[in-house]
């Protein structure tokens, strides 16, 4: 039956049923929540039962555990993430029924079509930068819509439909899907060699993709570029669009001066165009987070948010899930009290930045790291860089690689990485087969007063939460 738009009154009522395959993923769940708020009938399936699926179910989504062809029957549109295989039964059924299929990024682009879009791209720092930008615009009274790849702790969610005209979202370069977006503002935080398996193992193709991303801006659009990053700086010099730069470099349009770390906070002077300066206390540690804050400040300044309002938003920022989350102190069975920090970092450059933030904020503590490598391909491609940065900590425990659907690659597992670190002669890493074993092994490594960083993009975050909630194995209740 052909549906007539005139009879429905609007597009939501004409095509109301949207199904998400892999609804529990960070990018998918945020879009699903916004569409729920817009009035769509949202359903979805996922192999995992997590906080995102439970939240969506509470909001009214119909969430199914596991994938089945029957799940898409009666649906008007199916949204899929790039993690979904071509032989997924729901995807195959949607094709056979000629149900429209939308990649996740394409659906985000559809949402952006009805707002003024701000897309935040870059190999590292997207989630934090997008979250800070949402906080600055909210503090400035602009009530933005946001879609973030992590939980904004102040909102208790990774997405929100705002009443204002601006939508700020992460633009995912990992699979090239950010090239589906057509924002009015585009941020690039940095460009690094990651996800090369999706670019034919050719970094030049990664560089070209970021250049094309900026080409998708309209002629009246704006590129906000971090010129402290050499790759982004090179791009800034040749992009045929309006550019505003940010960074700690003297020639940045928006820059941070007199940067110092004070425990878990950063203090600096924010210098805006036309010479305006404002003191800022950022509620996040690390110089890398100062750069993220500068991008948010540049967005706020462009949209008329007052400098003191920008500073207030940065100072009151409550953080993002799994981005240097201080989970508190835990006591081992031997009585050692340690502070536990959970972080999503999984690339050598991210590890280096987090280690620097930890040492800058807690210089007198031993730095103990429990790390779960993410993907065999990344471990292989960044093997030497991983070995170098992980050799700098005081004690290291490695769990096996989180495969993320990949088959094992010889010489790219945690035991090979431990051998390479051991050969450097600076530390003696401990290897556990399963990430759940960290709770049992860590007490033998930890000393009183240590700072324990639990890092990785897999399921190590659940172990960190479990340790804080239930204690280490063998510890008194």
From Swiss-Prot:
InterPro entries: Mur-like_cat_sf (IPR036565), Mur_ligase_C (IPR004101), Mur_ligase_C_dom_sf (IPR036615), Mur_ligase_cen (IPR013221), Mur_ligase_N (IPR000713), MurCDEF_pg_biosynth (IPR050061), UDP-N-AcMur_Ala_ligase_MurC (IPR005758)
EC number: 6.3.2.8
Gene source species: Xanthomonas campestris pv. campestris (strain ATCC 33913 / DSM 3586 / NCPPB 528 / LMG 568 / P 25)
Pathway: Cell wall biogenesis; peptidoglycan biosynthesis
Catalytic activity annotation: UDP-N-acetyl-alpha-D-muramate + L-alanine + ATP = UDP-N-acetyl-alpha-D-muramoyl-L-alanine + ADP + phosphate + H(+)
EC category name: ligase
Assigned keywords, A-Z: ATP-binding, Cell cycle, Cell division, Cell shape, Cell wall biogenesis/degradation, Cytoplasm, Ligase, Nucleotide-binding, Peptidoglycan synthesis
Keyword Signal recorded: no
Family membership noted in the UniProt record: Belongs to the MurCDEF family.
Name this polypeptide is given: UDP-N-acetylmuramate--L-alanine ligase
Job description of the protein: Cell wall formation.
